[in-house]
């Protein structure tokens, strides 16, 4: 008798969209492209000693509520404007929880917080143009 020993915990399969498909569905806007380009140049100048400011990278570690994350980003942007001569503030957020072995795995893996694991929805949600164009 042959015993089933492989993939014993798999309960179903769902195809994950390739990255190029997500990128084609949600192209980056000119406004966001400019923000990323300019921010990277500023950070490079600071790290190479061409500026006296400090780069400050702040969380949250991961997000589960995109609207709350946008509100937080707006507050950081206001703070950065107030401290622009001293600091370059960068918001860093994970959409996954790479070190989590139990529990919720992050917005990409379970966007509805219901163990549905709709990765395609999660990828579209975190790359959605509506939040990215608000700052």
Which positions does each model-derived feature cover?
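A charged helix-plus-loop insertion that forms the helical arch/lid used to bind
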Residues: 102-121
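Short, well-ordered coil/turn segments that N-cap beta-strands
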Residues: 52-54, 85-87
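N- or domain-start disorder-to-order transition segments that initiate the globular core
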Residues: 14-47
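Active-site-proximal loop/turn and secondary-structure-junction residues that shape catalytic pockets
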Residues: 62, 93-99
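Polybasic, low-complexity association/targeting segments
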Residues: 1-14
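Single conserved hydrophobic/aromatic residue that forms the stacking wall/gate
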Residues: 126-135
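Glycine-rich anion/phosphate-binding loops
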Residues: 64-80, 119-125
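Hydrophobic faces of well-ordered beta-strands that scaffold small-molecule active sites
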Residues: 56-58, 89-93
